[in-house]
Amino acid sequence: MATSIDVVDLKGKKAGSIELPDSLFDVQTNIPLIHQVVTAQLAAARQGTHKTKNRGEVSGAGRKPFKQKGTGRARQGSIRAPQMTGGGIVHGPTPRDYSQRTPKKMIAAALLGALSDRARGSRIHAVQAFTAGEAPSTKAVVELLSGVATSKHVLVVLERDDELAFKSVRNIASVHALTYDQLNAYDVLVSDDIVFTQAALEGFIAAKSTSAATKKEEVNA
């Protein structure tokens, strides 16, 4: 049985309701799977441009720094040796690509598992819109969110063409905004509450339902 959540207007009053399909918002939350997907996502975000110079790359002459015997010091062959100050680094980091290949089905399952966890905790909300008129208003968004989601970290999910809402929320430190097609397990997990606009939630449900129907047809074909 699908769960329903209230849709509130700009004044924070109930303006309707919308159903959250069990196939999207009440699936198993596989913690090891989510951990693997999020770890891969964070790894892919690394630049991987770290680099140190080995003894063949640091500057310095190739001559022997002092004679082999008679100084009382340990013998040295080069000022570029790793034990010398300013010498090369042994086994230092080199540029590399940290990205991992994660199957699309795993990424999708991790997202739905994270959303289902938030839905079961009554942490998913819906609003009609964040702005009214043709001008962005951060003040209006803050007032609306104060009555909808009072947690420290809030994820706002919008439609891609909702520029007024993006401009209204981008200056709020505790709010992170995404479009519904950018939703991912990591951003859901680091947010205490997820607030959709009604249009964004309907778009997300429609997109996922269409994708599931297409896959079913391919299997039956």
From Swiss-Prot:
<dbReference type="GO" id="GO:0006412">
    <property type="term" value="P:translation"/>
</dbReference>
<dbReference type="GO" id="GO:0005840">
    <property type="term" value="C:ribosome"/>
</dbReference>
<dbReference type="GO" id="GO:0019843">
    <property type="term" value="F:rRNA binding"/>
</dbReference>
<keyword id="KW-0699">rRNA-binding</keyword>
<feature type="region of interest" description="Disordered">
    <location>
        <begin position="45"/>
        <end position="100"/>
    </location>
</feature>
<comment type="similarity">
    <text>Belongs to the universal ribosomal protein uL4 family.</text>
</comment>
<comment type="subunit">
    <text>Part of the 50S ribosomal subunit.</text>
</comment>
<keyword id="KW-0694">RNA-binding</keyword>
<dbReference type="Pfam" id="PF00573">
    <property type="entry name" value="Ribosomal_L4"/>
</dbReference>
<dbReference type="InterPro" id="IPR023574">
    <property type="entry name" value="Ribosomal_uL4_dom_sf"/>
</dbReference>
<keyword id="KW-0689">Ribosomal protein</keyword>
<dbReference type="GO" id="GO:0003735">
    <property type="term" value="F:structural constituent of ribosome"/>
</dbReference>
<dbReference type="GO" id="GO:1990904">
    <property type="term" value="C:ribonucleoprotein complex"/>
</dbReference>
<dbReference type="InterPro" id="IPR013005">
    <property type="entry name" value="Ribosomal_uL4-like"/>
</dbReference>
<comment type="function">
    <text>One of the primary rRNA binding proteins, this protein initially binds near the 5'-end of the 23S rRNA. It is important during the early stages of 50S assembly. It makes multiple contacts with different domains of the 23S rRNA in the assembled 50S subunit and ribosome.</text>
</comment>
<protein>
    <recommendedName>
        <fullName>Large ribosomal subunit protein uL4</fullName>
    </recommendedName>
</protein>
<dbReference type="InterPro" id="IPR002136">
    <property type="entry name" value="Ribosomal_uL4"/>
</dbReference>
<keyword id="KW-0687">Ribonucleoprotein</keyword>
<comment type="function">
    <text>Forms part of the polypeptide exit tunnel.</text>
</comment>
